[in-house]
Structures are given as C-alpha cells and as structure tokens.
Amino acid sequence: MNNRFLDACWGKPVDRTPVWLMRQAGRYLPEYMAVRSKCTFLELCKTPELAAEVTLQPVDILGVDAAILFSDILTPVEPMGLKLDFVPGPVFETPVRTMADVERLRIPNPEEDVPYVLDTIKILRKELAGRVPLIGFGGAPFTLACYMVEGKGSKDWATIKRMMYAAPEVYAALMDKVTMMDMEYLNAQIRAGAQAIQIFDTWGGVLSPTDYEKFVLPYTRKLINGLNRQNTPVIHFVKGAGTMLETVQKAGGDVMGLDWHVNLGKARDVLGPNMAVQGNLDPTVLYAPKEVIEVEVKRVLDENAGRPGHIFNLGHGILPTVPPENAIHMVECVHRLSQK
C-alpha cells in the first residue's frame, strides 16, 4: 500500500512528498464529464457506483497519492429538512432565519438518511484495495450554516453575519445543531472506512480573526474533538485563514490546509513542528507552460525545506478548464523533485 499520504499526515518521514488535488474528480477530466453527462450532479452524488467511478478516475489518470470521496459538502444538510437543488450552484428553497426554523431541523441518521455516501466509501475501499488511502470529508459547521442561512452562495455572507450580532441565540442554536449533524456524519464515514477526514471551512476566512475566534472556533473544535479518530488523521482547511493561523490551529486536527495566500515555510514556522500542512499551489498556475508549473512546484517544495509532514496540494480546488495533462505534469513534478 502507498502510505505516503497517511505518514505525512502524522508527520512521519516519507521517501517523496505525497500529492492530491482538491476537486481532483471534476469537470477538467473528460472521463468525469462522460459520466456526468448521463445524470444530474445530485444523481451522481447519490449513486454509489457512479460516485465511486469518478472518485477513482484521478487516482488512475493523475497518479495521486490519495483518493477523496466524491460528494458535496451540503449532502448531509438536505435530510435535516432543507430541500437542496443545484441551478447551477447550491440553492435551499427555505433558508434558516428564525429560531422556529432552527427547531424544525432534525439531526439525520447517516446510515438511514445518506446511505449512498457510506456505500460509496465501502465500494471504494474494496476497489482501491490498498493502492492509496481514501479521504472522507465534510463542510465545517460555519460554512454549512452560511449556505443554510443565505439559501445560496454569496460574496459577503451578510445574512449570517447579521444573525451573529442581531440574533446570537438563533446563530448559536443553529451552529450547535449543525455541529452535531456534522459529527454524526463524519463518524459514520470513519466507520464505513474513510482513512482520513478533511473538514472544509471555505468561508471561515470571510470573518475577522476576532469574530472567527468567537463565532466559529468553538464549534469546529467541538466537531474535531467529537470525532472517533484514533488512527484517522483530520485535515482542517480554512480558506483565507493566513492572517489567523494560530487561532485556527486551536481547533485541533492533525493537518492544516493552506491556501496560496501564505508562504508555506512561514506558515510552518508559526504552526510549529507538531502540525503537518497541506498545500498550497495557486490553482491558476496549472494554466501555465509546463516549465513554469515545474518552477512553481519547486518553489512550494523549497518553502517546506524538506520538513516532514507536508502534503502537496493546490490552495483550493482545481479549476474546471485546466488541461488534464498539466495536472498530470504537476503530480509528476512533485514526485520527481521531492524524491529522497
């Protein structure tokens, strides 16, 4: 088995830097589009055989060191009682705005309400047969609450920010419920066979460090502390968190995901030797000529300076119009340039 990814999560030495890409199963791959053309996005997420097929594609095509479950962060929110659609982009018909709205939300039973996610994990563990580890994932409570309150995507998330200050009791009740749901969902993924968990806090960085510490940190910390993760590393990725790494670190977890706005070496200096890191190439670099991609890969590796506990990744998801051969080249460069 290729254990480089898991070893790096635990800060152990590896023979070369492991690499995978956020959104590595996605629209930039013709093979993904061939599957996606036959069904809607939600149907793809809810059909274990198809979700497993697209999860495996980048392992075979790119040669990455980990597979990540194909799903969506909002999958477990729908059975809380919110109708979800993609038109495109996620839309909830009835956003959560009042205490009555929060009280109507239920905590789903993952085995009963999202069995397709757990079945996908079981299929993947069998299909991967130890080739590379399988990462499960979920959205952080704050990012999930952003969509639930706004009802759709937003540039500034003003509605949930207003709730924090104007209706703090509603915000706290919602975050408590979402955190409980998240904990049940991620623990079910671990029971089903996920070998690592990534928590995506895509919108955590829209808050000031003070607001993050007050309104977000307690819930993410509670979530991470509530995971049954003796042998399952947890990666915590907060996009835009470069100005508050030490605060985000207080949430716990084993690996800090970094976006491209921070120098990886300086981030490691701040976080200390006991926190592994993942990142952090700007996704747009994959539009560059191959020799430029190689230079940029080397720069990120040089910033890490050979320290154990580095997983190479993009600073956010791969973009849908990136040429697949450039992603393949990036993976090859990481492996070749980091070979011990």
From Swiss-Prot:
Where, subcellularly, is it found? Cytoplasm
Which segment of the chain is annotated as a signal peptide? none
Protein name per the record: Uroporphyrinogen decarboxylase
**Enzyme class, broadest EC rank:** lyase
GO MF, one term, reads: uroporphyrinogen decarboxylase activity
Q: What is its EC number?
A: 4.1.1.37
Physiological role = Catalyzes the decarboxylation of four acetate groups of uroporphyrinogen-III to yield coproporphyrinogen-III.
**Signal among the record's keywords?**
no
Q: Which GO terms describe its cellular component?
A: cytosol
